[in-house]
């Protein structure tokens, strides 16, 4: 006779939502009046990963999640944590979710991924082929990094003609990316948005470099635990997506964590799959955060989980032809009072010194007067943070008319 399974705890979707928001740093507290490097570091340690993306329609994506939670913080604090030398260096770049910034403490947990990459696993097929066939080029590029220190691909580019594939990358650029994936080099800093590569031992703390090597199963299990803590609650797919882990090791790792008592299985009302959370979790009575969210924010980057939690279908339409877009080019969800209440198409028009609001779409049942005032305040604060004196409401929808009224009643100017 099979052993009787323990009864799984059940929570409502509202409780799951509050648990997720709280775990992700939306706990309803007012942001600190003065944000310090400690606030930035603590938040990133809590999230575990910031996704990097090259789109700069508003601001580079890795800056936005901190703004959504901390408010008007100096972007240089993240730059220092990510790319400074010495004690201020708290982060490293690697393939976490996608291209990501991660706390340096997670570096040992990524070595298995680096080892796989060096064997051509878990990387693009063309890069794996390059790694097999171009070891002479790779060795030459690695030697140049050893001798010259932090350098970019342009420094090594010997190509005379356009190469064609790989986004028109030179052989040296592909070699650097292969070395980066394999952990042979890391990102020492950036020149604009260009990566500057150096040897890990010249960039990262010695305690991290000399950390005893972990078994892959142990490292993967630790990443899963970090993901559960960061998400608050999630299905197996939600959790393994956080650090882009494969299904089989994720299932095994979660089962081991349950057996160890590090996490527990629960049921969320309306979810078809079982969920996981920490054993001693506390659901907030309410969450009062209001925030504009990056499309690459870890709260919403797993779109099916976003639909289950918030009943909110969201797709980024940057690569959708203009005439086929439903909501706009660069649309930020607006989180207000535990729900995603609106979508705002925004652009930083830096030459004109203004934040342009190109579309305002309310989600059912819409924003009440207080919610619309909160949106106006968020937009004004965002413009201030970006150093843009003006806000242009360039939309003829009824929601935009309500937003104009909210701006005027709050004493904010707009165009």
Predicted regions and their residues:
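Long, charged, low-complexity, helical-prone intrinsically disordered regions
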Residues: 1-415
């Amino acid at each position: 006779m099979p052993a009787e399974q323990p009864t799984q705890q059940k929570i409502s979707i509202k409780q799951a939502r509050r648990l997720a928001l709280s775990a992700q740093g939306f706990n309803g507290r007012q942001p600190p009046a003065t944000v310090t490097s400690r606030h930035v570091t603590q938040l990133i340690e809590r999230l575990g990963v910031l996704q990097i993306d090259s789109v700069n329609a508003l601001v580079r994506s890795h800056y936005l999640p901190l703004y959504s939670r901390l408010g008007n913080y100096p972007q240089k604090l993240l730059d220092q944590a990510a790319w400074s030398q010495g004690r201020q260096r708290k982060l490293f770049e690697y393939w976490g979710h996608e291209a990501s910034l991660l706390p340096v403490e997670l570096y040992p947990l990524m070595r298995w991924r680096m080892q796989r990459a060096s064997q051509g696993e878990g990387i693009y097929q063309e890069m794996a082929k390059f790694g097999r066939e171009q070891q002479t080029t790779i060795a030459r590029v690695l030697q140049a990094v050893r001798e010259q220190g932090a350098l970019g691909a342009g420094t090594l580019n010997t190509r005379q003609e356009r190469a064609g594939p790989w986004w028109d990358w030179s052989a040296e650029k592909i070699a650097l990316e292969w070395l980066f994936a394999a952990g042979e080099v890391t990102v020492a800093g950036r020149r604009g948005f260009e990566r500057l590569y150096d040897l890990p031992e010249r960039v990262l703390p010695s305690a991290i470099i000399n950390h005893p090597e972990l078994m892959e199963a142990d490292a993967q299990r630790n990443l899963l635990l970090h993901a559960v803590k960061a998400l608050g609650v999630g299905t197996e797919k939600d959790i393994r997506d956080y650090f882009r882990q494969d299904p089989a090791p994720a299932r095994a790792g979660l089962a081991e964590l349950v057996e160890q008592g590090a996490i527990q299985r629960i049921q969320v009302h309306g979810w078809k799959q079982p969920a996981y959370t920490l054993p001693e979790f506390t659901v907030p009575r309410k969450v009062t955060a209001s925030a504009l969210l990056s499309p690459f924010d870890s709260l919403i980057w797993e779109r099916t989980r976003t639909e289950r939690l918030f009943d909110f279908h969201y797709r980024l339409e940057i690569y959708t032809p203009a005439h086929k877009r439903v909501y706009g080019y660069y649309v930020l969800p607006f989180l207000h009072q535990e729900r995603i209440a609106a979508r705002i198409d925004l652009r930083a028009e830096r030459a004109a010194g203004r934040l342009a609001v190109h579309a305002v779409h309310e989600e059912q049942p819409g924003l009440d007067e207080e919610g619309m005032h909160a949106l106006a305040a968020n937009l004004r604060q965002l413009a201030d943070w970006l150093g843009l004196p003006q806000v242009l409401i360039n939309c003829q929808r009824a929601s935009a008319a309500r937003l104009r009224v909210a701006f005027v009643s709050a004493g904010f100017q707009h165009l």
